[in-house]
Curated annotation (Swiss-Prot):
<feature type="modified residue" description="Phosphoserine">
    <location>
        <position position="669"/>
    </location>
</feature>
<feature type="modified residue" description="Phosphothreonine; by TOR2">
    <location>
        <position position="659"/>
    </location>
</feature>
<feature type="compositionally biased region" description="Basic residues">
    <location>
        <begin position="1"/>
        <end position="12"/>
    </location>
</feature>
<dbReference type="InterPro" id="IPR000719">
    <property type="entry name" value="Prot_kinase_dom"/>
</dbReference>
<comment type="similarity">
    <text>Belongs to the protein kinase superfamily. AGC Ser/Thr protein kinase family. RAC subfamily.</text>
</comment>
<dbReference type="GO" id="GO:0004674">
    <property type="term" value="F:protein serine/threonine kinase activity"/>
</dbReference>
<keyword id="KW-0961">Cell wall biogenesis/degradation</keyword>
<feature type="compositionally biased region" description="Polar residues">
    <location>
        <begin position="101"/>
        <end position="115"/>
    </location>
</feature>
<dbReference type="GO" id="GO:0106310">
    <property type="term" value="F:protein serine kinase activity"/>
</dbReference>
<keyword id="KW-0133">Cell shape</keyword>
<dbReference type="Pfam" id="PF00433">
    <property type="entry name" value="Pkinase_C"/>
</dbReference>
<feature type="compositionally biased region" description="Polar residues">
    <location>
        <begin position="61"/>
        <end position="93"/>
    </location>
</feature>
<dbReference type="InterPro" id="IPR017892">
    <property type="entry name" value="Pkinase_C"/>
</dbReference>
<dbReference type="InterPro" id="IPR008271">
    <property type="entry name" value="Ser/Thr_kinase_AS"/>
</dbReference>
<dbReference type="InterPro" id="IPR011009">
    <property type="entry name" value="Kinase-like_dom_sf"/>
</dbReference>
<feature type="modified residue" description="Phosphothreonine">
    <location>
        <position position="63"/>
    </location>
</feature>
<dbReference type="GO" id="GO:0005634">
    <property type="term" value="C:nucleus"/>
</dbReference>
Amino acid sequence: MHSWRISKFKLGRSKEDDGSSEDENEKSWGNGLFHFHHGEKHHDGSPKNHNHEHEHHIRKINTNETLPSSLSSPKLRNDASFKNPSGIGNDNSKASERKASQSSTETQGPSSESGLMTVKVYSGKDFTLPFPITSNSTILQKLLSSGILTSSSNDASEVAAIMRQLPRYKRVDQDSAGEGLIDRAFATKFIPSSILLPGSTNSSPLLYFTIEFDNSITTISPDMGTMEQPVFNKISTFDVTRKLRFLKIDVFARIPSLLLPSKNWQQEIGEQDEVLKEILKKINTNQDIHLDSFHLPLNLKIDSAAQIRLYNHHWISLERGYGKLNITVDYKPSKNKPLSIDDFDLLKVIGKGSFGKVMQVRKKDTQKIYALKALRKAYIVSKCEVTHTLAERTVLARVDCPFIVPLKFSFQSPEKLYLVLAFINGGELFYHLQHEGRFSLARSRFYIAELLCALDSLHKLDVIYRDLKPENILLDYQGHIALCDFGLCKLNMKDNDKTDTFCGTPEYLAPEILLGQGYTKTVDWWTLGILLYEMMTGLPPYYDENVPVMYKKILQQPLLFPDGFDPAAKDLLIGLLSRDPSRRLGVNGTDEIRNHPFFKDISWKKLLLKGYIPPYKPIVKSEIDTANFDQEFTKEKPIDSVVDEYLSASIQKQFGGWTYIGDEQLGDSPSQGRSIS
């Protein structure tokens, strides 16, 4: 398990950076440390060692080796001080396409004023399943008896009333040896929306849904009722720091496998319907299934200080017709009041380094769960990282992409800087890749497509990412990717602008970086290609434990593919991994990559709406689950303490404009509050 990714600082600078000369930096930093995330490998490419905290000193390259002189004294970023890591479906929903089209035409990005949005969920109706269920009366009666059907303590009469309807809905399936089934349209009448497990006083939902806004998630479970007509009566409040245009609802079902028709029926239907085959497979392995979605349009650009009711007891029909929900949505603009650490409950430590801590926190007024990263100002100043720290905050505040971890708030105390980010708890892509060894073609394509959107959104803001690798990619609760760690980003890079800072991770360094030729945005397409190759084979294409040898391979070794490698993926990789940046796929814009045959079955508009069901869903029990984080950190007690580090007024002035609660810049002065050590 791995902890929240904490931004790493670059060792050394080039002439692009202000404040110190290269000689001064060389003297200050000496030989850097590279972070190696790959353990020793088996001959088949699968990981032998799952510990990715290996750190290797980079020796000075021998002048007799045939490598560029620019590599003789590499000025690299330092990872040593941070001990923590932080099947596309066939649904062609016209509603998804239409909403995505509307979203894609608005290029100005989200408005940035703060407020609170309250969502009240009352009930649901007309929920159905995509398959029939057994009509076995013993199984159905036992399941209903364990359910919470009404507000009364005794549901026996309700169970009896439901069971009396069974003959009316039972049918005989002539295609499966005369098995008695209940049609998919009526099956939910006989399934409770939640049940009480034996020996437990807590209910377990068989139907539930999530509400997602700006990567903040709330899970809504029913209080009572059948799956056909669940009763929720729940309220959830969201912090609004960006006025996004949609609120996303996803409905899930947790179907006991005993309810499924016979194995013969499942085999027969699976041969006819691949989608249903995958659904049945998930149920048989005790996985929740995704039933339906809805993108609720929002108009939060309201010039009013009063609370506005956006929807009043409004029935929404889910996009694929599997049910309806009754909701009310209110929005209240709020005054731009700067936050402090006292506005949060500290729940868990999820990361730690010499700079401070990363903690799971709960915002007291909305009860929303976030990741709070605390950066010690004295450490940042001592490492000459003020510019890059401010750049990271700027990128996070400006970016508008569903596949990038968004900044919710930032504030400061006299001793610290704080970033409050969406809490993404599905684990690092690195961990999942180590566990699997390699990914399937469909799974690799899905992740690369979402990453392509993330990088494109950064490039449109004239930002180069420069550090794409599995450790910097998180999975959310559904399995969508979330790019994080923007400590090596370079801002204000137009299409043809070049920079020459030597930074990154060895396995992913592009040839133009090694050659010291300067590089443009196309360096990100090289790293995207390296990552795709690693996903599909288990190792980067030029990997070697000996760093100088690996550099030689990056510059000289032909790109090799295993037998049976997908032809479209091979062609894409040849384009992305062109050593000549001027001929690299993507040099003329992201559409060059999007239009490649490798992505021919992907609707990019649907993808941006998170309209595809991810090929893998991480094991996440709830929005506060920290099981995918390193227990070395989560077992620590979160402590709010004072840091005694005095900084002069001139140094404090460097952190002016750090505060963010919905506006790009709201405050220049550090608040007088407690800080986290």
